[in-house]
């Protein structure tokens, strides 16, 4: 009995220790953005983790920080009325390295909040994290995370929860989850429209993820799955989100070295941003609502998309198997040149050795199911499902889709439209608008096998001479 009592007392004490709050103002942080409170924040995080876990609490007020590193069993809680600003001085950002190898980790990276190989971490509350990312200029085509910080980055971590917080104004991608397992993201509000490469959310080679009830407004892509290493994105659900994007609202790609398997996308509302005061990429009404891409090798399979409500976008649905062939490894000299070019801001004279190694194998897209999609006020590009000669897209099933768009294509336009399609553009960056308006007002299908349509209808605002469906090299 005494042994049992001792054990229970130990367990209660352990739980109490884990539940402890570390309020940053108790450790010297002040609501004052004239100076950073990085050291205090990091002290609280380290103490919390060392003592078995608990909450690091940011109370109401305005605070400024440079890079902080999260630890296992830490719950970062932002109270209502709390705003944590990122420093606008790059000297306050630490260059971080990781043992995980991917296209995005060959060089040290900078981010406001970073975690590597952690377990059981939570970021939540009704406060705000603001990266103040507009002050970091784009210096070269590959400077994301090198001269412009991510706001939030998790690498090879497990049991991650991000809930209810507002995230805004990152220097590049807002959130990058790389090779993470068991991630839950819900109820967050993301505004990222102040710089180039302003994605709202990037899941990269992650497993067992649920993204739900997210409100996202981004200049670049909205909710994006990537694969910048051989590790697939697998067993991921994206549901009940509202997304505004000048580019692709929901996207699988562009990096696809591993690929995507068992992906569910449902209950998504896509609409143009109410704020059109600035634009770095894309189109005011968005480029696409749904982009499914394999262009760097890899396989996409078992993707189910349902219940999309779309306002705008130039080309609502884009399925593309291409062969850009960008790998995830570098020669050593190439990696050094890659970061040196980014830091110098130079774009000229980039040689092949400065770019990632090539992928020789064309990837694969198969078993895609798209159902119950409603589109209104779209552009007149049309939708497309395209592979390459001898590399068809396979088993794509589209049902219960209605699209209303601008229309207006005339007989005199068809020659130019068909001429543009003579170029397969196999190695080009995939974009739903890459060929211009398509030969079909509804769906253009090329190099495909086992594609089916059921209850698909396209109507146009202005008369449009194109047929609803055009298929080439289709079995």
Each predicted region: which residue ranges?
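Extracellular/periplasmic carbohydrate-active domains that bind, remodel
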Residues: 16-475
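Bacterial N-terminal signal peptides
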Residues: 5-14
């Amino acid at each position: 009995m005494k042994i049992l009592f001792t054990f229970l007392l130990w367990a209660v004490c352990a739980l109490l220790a884990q539940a402890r709050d570390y309020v940053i103002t108790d450790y010297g942080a002040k609501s004052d953005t004239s100076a950073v409170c990085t050291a205090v924040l990091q002290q609280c995080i380290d103490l919390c983790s060392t003592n078995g876990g608990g909450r690091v609490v940011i109370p109401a007020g305005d605070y400024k920080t440079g890079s902080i590193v999260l630890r296992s069993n830490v719950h970062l809680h932002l109270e209502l009325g709390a705003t944590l600003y990122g420093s606008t001085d790059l000297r306050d950002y630490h260059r971080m390295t990781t043992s995980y190898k991917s296209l995005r980790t060959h060089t040290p990276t900078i981010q406001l909040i970073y975690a590597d190989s952690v377990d059981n971490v939570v970021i939540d509350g009704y406060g705000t994290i603001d990266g103040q990312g507009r002050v970091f200029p784009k210096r070269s085509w590959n400077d994301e995370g090198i001269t412009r910080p991510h706001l939030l980055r998790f690498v090879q971590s497990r049991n991650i929860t991000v809930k209810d917080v507002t995230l805004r104004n990152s220097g590049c991608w807002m959130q990058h989850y790389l090779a993470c397992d068991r991630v839950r993201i819900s109820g967050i509000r993301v505004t990222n429209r102040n710089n180039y490469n302003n994605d709202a959310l990037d899941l990269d080679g992650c497993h067992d993820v649920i993204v739900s009830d997210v409100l996202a407004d981004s200049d670049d892509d909205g909710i994006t799955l990537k694969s910048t290493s051989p590790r697939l994105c697998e067993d991921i659900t994206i549901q009940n989100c509202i997304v505004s994007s000048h580019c692709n609202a929901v996207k699988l790609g562009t990096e696809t070295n591993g690929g995507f398997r068992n992906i569910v996308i449902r209950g998504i509302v896509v609409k143009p941003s109410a704020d059109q005061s600035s634009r770095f990429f894309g189109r005011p009404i968005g480029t696409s609502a749904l982009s499914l891409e394999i262009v760097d090798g890899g396989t996409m399979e078992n993707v189910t998309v349902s219940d999309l409500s779309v306002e705008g976008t130039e080309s609502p649905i884009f399925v593309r198997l291409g062969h850009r062939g960008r790998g995830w490894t570098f020669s050593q000299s190439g990696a050094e040149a890659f970061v040196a070019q980014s830091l110098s801001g130079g774009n000229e004279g980039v040689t092949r050795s400065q770019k990632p190694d090539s992928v020789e194998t064309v990837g694969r897209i198969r078993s895609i199911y798209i159902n119950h999609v409603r589109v209104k006020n779209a552009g007149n590009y049309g939708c497309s499902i395209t592979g390459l000669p001898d590399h068809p897209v396979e088993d794509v099933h589209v049902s219960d889709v209605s699209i209303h768009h601008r229309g207006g294509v005339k007989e005199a336009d068809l020659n130019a439209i068909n001429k543009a399609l003579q170029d397969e553009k196999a190695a080009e960056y995939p974009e739903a608008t890459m060929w211009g308006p398509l030969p079909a007002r509804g769906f253009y299908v090329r190099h495909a096998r086992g594609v089916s349509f059921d209850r698909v209808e396209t109507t146009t605002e202005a008369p449009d001479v194109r047929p609803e469906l055009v298929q080439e090299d289709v079995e």
